Each structure stands twice: as C-alpha cells, then as structure tokens.
Amino acid sequence: MLLALAFAAAASTVTPSDLHVDRLQPGTATYLVYFHGAPGSGISRAMLATSTLSRERIDGQDAWVIEQHWENETGVAHTARTVHAADDLATLSQVSTWIRPDATITTRVVPAEGRGTIEGELPADRRERMEKGFATMDDGWWFNWHSDLALLPLLPYERGGTLRVHLFDVGMDAPKDVDYTVLGERTLVAGDGSTRYDCWLVETESGSPGSGNYQRFWIDKARRVVVKEEDVFNGQYRSKVLLGVPAVVEFALPASTPAAP
C-alpha cells in the first residue's frame, strides 16, 4: 500500500504548456493494426489505419485537424475528423463513425458546449454512458484519447518517470487521469538496415492499474512519432506498426472494359 502511494505521488501531471506542440507537422501516416496471440499463432482482424494531420482555420480559430480512415478486408471500418485548438490541443469538435457488421454508429461532439449526439442503434446502457460523458466534456482541459497516435509523442518523456495525463474519449462517462511510465529506451532498425529509431519505451495500464492490460509505445525521440505499439488485453495482443510510407492510392483504377461479345 505504501509503495503504491509513493508511486502515485511520484507521477508528474502534464498540463497543456508541457506539450511539445511545436513539433507537430502536417503529413499522412499509416499503421498496420492487427490482433494476435503468441508467436506463430497467426493474426486476425488486420486493418490499415491512415491519419492525415493538417493545419487549418476553423470558424476563425487556428486549428490542427486529424482525419482518420481505417480500412479492413470488408471495407471502411472507421472514420473520424477531430479538430484541435492549435495552441493547447483542446478538442474543438469531433465526428466519428464506426462501421460494424451489425451496426453503424456515428457520434458528433462539441466539447466546449458539453454537447454530443449519437446516430445508430446502441444498447441502452452504452447510450446512457456516452450521453453522460458528453455532459462532462466542458469541465476543464483534457487530452483526446482518440488522437493518441498523433499526439502522444508530444508528451514530455524527457522528464522520465511517470507522466499523468487527464484523458477523455467518446464512450467514457467522464475524463480520467491516466499514467504513462517511461520504462527506458529502445532502438528499432528499419528493414533497410540503416534507418534507426531511437525510442522511449512507454507503458500505461490505461487508467486501470492491476487489470493486467497494458499499452506499450515505442516513440521516436528525434521525430516525435509512434513507431510501434503493443497492447495486451483479454489474453491477446493488438499491435500497431508504422509503415515506411503511407498506404495511399496515387493512381485511379482504369475504367472497366465491357467483355467482347
């Protein structure tokens, strides 16, 4: 108990002024996302998650906009457009859609007004939880969990130790504090044998200590980018690996030619 209290006291709270917002750059990145068990057990539910970050002027306010597009073997699985204030990355608005075989759910939120809407069929308890969370969005600054791949690298990992971040994502009933601990350093080498990623290795239990569930991130120090993520939950892994170039189609498919009679 005393050890747990000492560990909690050692956490350093992250405020908007601590974020390395100046390191954000417009661009597009794609992650391969897949689920798997032990090595050799096979993979499942593979997806390509592409995010485009751009600087825009939204309703007269300088903003960073993150467009997400997730695609699996059946088509589009998820899209999101999140608008962040350019100075402190507060969430100004977000539209998010999840497409599943049994339902399509779209949420729209305006955090400063504590307002959100849900389109699509949801179990009553999940809808109630989401609507409860909407009302808490205007209660101070929070970090948008949905934008973590783009924004997590901006945390002050150079401090070392444990960083405490006030987080929220649509679906939660309220923002909560989540601890990210710098476990050490790792170097990843790309397939060309020469490109090196000198990374912080960062771990979190996603605000549920003792659950046995973890997220671990390899965050490149120089580039401030997530190179790899390994999540452990329910006895399996979910991995995300940054591709060397974004998976974006450059040339359109040729028009189909009618079959000869």
Residue ranges and their predicted role:
Residues M1-A10:
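Sec-dependent N-terminal signal peptides
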Residues L5, V33, K132-A135, D139-F143, ...:
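Short non-domain terminal segments
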Residues S12-G114, G161-P261:
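Acidic, serine/threonine-rich low-complexity disordered tracts
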Residues G114-R164:
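Surface-exposed beta-loop interaction hotspot
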